[in-house]
Amino acid sequence: MSCPRLVIAGTSSGAGKTSLTLGLTAALRRRGLKVQTFKVGPDFLDPTWLSLASERPCINLDGWMCGERYVRDRFATATADADIAIVEGVMGLFDGADPAAAAGSTAEIARWLDAPVLLVVNAHGMARSLAALVKGYAEFDPDLHLAGVIANRCGSTRHGDWLSEALCAAGMPPLTGTVIRDSLPPLPSRHLGLVTADRQHLTSEALNTLADAVERQLDMPRILDLAEKVPATPGVAATASSTEGRPVRIGMAFDEAFHFYYPDNLQALEDAGATLVRFSPMHDDTLPADLDALLLGGGYPEEYADTLETNQTMRQAVADFAAADRPIYAECGGLMYLSEGIELRDGSRHAMTGALPFATRMLATRKRLGYAEVRHLAHGPFGPAGTCLRGHEFHYSEAIAEPAAPGWQSAWQVSYRRSNKPVAEGYQRGRLFASYVHTHFASRPGAARAFVDFCRGES
C-alpha cells in the first residue's frame, strides 16, 4: 500500500467530517488527482455521496465485520490506480463495536492502514480547551498517528489563530484548517441519516461550493504533504475468483427504493460466476427474463410505497417467483417488499407482494441499530445449519405479526453486540430467505460462492 492516504476522523458524530471529506475529495479532483474514497463502518448512505464526489465506487472498510487481512487487501486493490486515498471515519475516532476495545472503530482502520489522521473538532465556543481535548485524543492510543486538526464551526479566522497557538504551545499536532461557522452547505437527511446521494442533491455546483470552501480554509499543501509521508505497507494477495459451474443470472432490485448493497458483496458474486441483472420494482413492468434468483437489498421502500403498490404487474411477478420456490434473498427493505404490505406512520397501508405471510409497519422510533453475528438455523443461502456470518441492522420498521402459515421458520440465530442472549430472526421457507440483517460476505470465506451455488439450486 504505497498510495498517499488520509483518514478524516471526528471527535463525535456531527463534527462535520462528511462535508469536509466531500469538499476535500472535490478539491483534490479539481487538481487532477484520482481520488479513491472509503467509509469506515457498515453505513450505506455516506458512500453514495463519496462515490459521486470521487466518481469512483466508495468502499466500506469495517474491522468488525471483515477483519484486518481483508481490510488491508481491499485497500490495496482499490487504490492500485489511485493518486490518493481519503478514508472517512465513523462516529468519534475511537467509537466502534466494543466500549472497551478498538474493534470496528476508525482508529483501528487507521492503524491497520498506517494512515495519518486529521481530527475534525467542533470548535464552537472553545479556545485553549481545544488543546486539552486534542491532547486526550493524541495520547489515548500511542500507536495512532494523529497528524493534524481541523477546527470546524469557528467564529472567525482570528478564532482559528488562537486555536493554532494553543495547539502549538501544548505540543499538539498542528491546525490544518479553520472552517468558519456556516461556510459549508448543509447536507439533506432523513430518518436513517443522510439521504441517498444523487445529482439532484449533490450537483456539480454544490461540489464546487464545497471544494471552494475547503481550498479557502484548509492548509492544502500541508495536508497533501501529510498524506504522502506514509510507509509502503504490503497488501495481501487477492484471492483468485472461482467461476466453476453453469452461469447464474441473479435479478438485483435497484432503484430509488432499493440500493443498499455493499459493492464488495456484488463484486464477490460476480467473481463467483454470477451475472447481476438490475431491475426496478418501481418502474419496470415485470422481471427480466431467464433469472435464476432474486436479490432484494435494503433501501427506502416506505418512501416510495405508493409507487411500489401501483406497479401491480411487478408485484405479481415477484409473488409468482416466490410461489414457484425460486431462490430469493431479501434484506431489510427487501423483506418489507416481500411482505403483504407496508403500514406507514400516518396509518395508511400499501400492498406489497405478499410473498411473506405478514405485513410490516413503520415506527416513530428506531427499532434496532447495531452489529449482529448470524448463524443459519437450517440449510440456507450460505451453507448448512450452523454457518456463521457477520452483519449490521439499522431500521425503523417491524413485522406486525409473526408468520402463522405452515412451513415457515426463523432464518437466523442472531447474537447482537449489546446482548448476551441470542434470538431467532428472519423468515425462511423453501428457497425464500428474508431478514433485517445486512450481511457482509467478507465475514465468511466462501460465502459468495455458497450463495451462487444456492442460486443454481446446487446447495
Swiss-Prot record:
Cofactor: Mg(2+)
Gene Ontology terms, MF aspect: ATP binding; cobyrinic acid a,c-diamide synthase activity
CDD domains given in the database record: CobB_N (cd05388), GATase1_CobB (cd03130)
InterPro entries from the UniProt entry: CbiA/CobB_synth, Class_I_gatase-like, CobQ/CobB/MinD/ParA_Nub-bd_dom, GATase_3, P-loop_NTPase
Annotated keywords: ATP-binding, Cobalamin biosynthesis, Glutamine amidotransferase, Ligase, Magnesium, Nucleotide-binding
The protein's Enzyme Commission number: 6.3.5.11
Alphabetical list of Pfam families matching this protein: CbiA (PF01656), GATase_3 (PF07685)
Alphabetical list of SUPFAM superfamilies matching this protein: Class I glutamine amidotransferase-like, P-loop containing nucleoside triphosphate hydrolases
Domain of life: Bacteria
ATP-binding listed as a keyword: yes
One BP annotation, GO: cobalamin biosynthetic process
Recorded catalytic activity of this chain's protein: cob(II)yrinate + 2 L-glutamine + 2 ATP + 2 H2O = cob(II)yrinate a,c diamide + 2 L-glutamate + 2 ADP + 2 phosphate + 2 H(+)
The GATase cobBQ-type domain, residue ranges: 249-446
Record: active site: 332 (nucleophile)
Site feature: Increases nucleophilicity of active site Cys: 438
Pathway: Cofactor biosynthesis; adenosylcobalamin biosynthesis; cob(II)yrinate a,c-diamide from sirohydrochlorin (anaerobic route): step 10/10
Other facts: The a and c carboxylates of cobyrinate are activated for nucleophilic attack via formation of a phosphorylated intermediate by ATP. CbiA catalyzes first the amidation of the c-carboxylate, and then that of the a-carboxylate.
Notes on the domains: Comprises of two domains. The C-terminal domain contains the binding site for glutamine and catalyzes the hydrolysis of this substrate to glutamate and ammonia. The N-terminal domain is anticipated to bind ATP and cobyrinate and catalyzes the ultimate synthesis of the diamide product. The ammonia produced via the glutaminase domain is probably translocated to the adjacent domain via a molecular tunnel, where it reacts with an activated intermediate.
Function: Catalyzes the ATP-dependent amidation of the two carboxylate groups at positions a and c of cobyrinate, using either L-glutamine or ammonia as the nitrogen source.
PANTHER family documented for this protein: COBYRINATE A,C-DIAMIDE SYNTHASE
Similarity remark: Belongs to the CobB/CbiA family.
The protein, known as: Cobyrinate a,c-diamide synthase
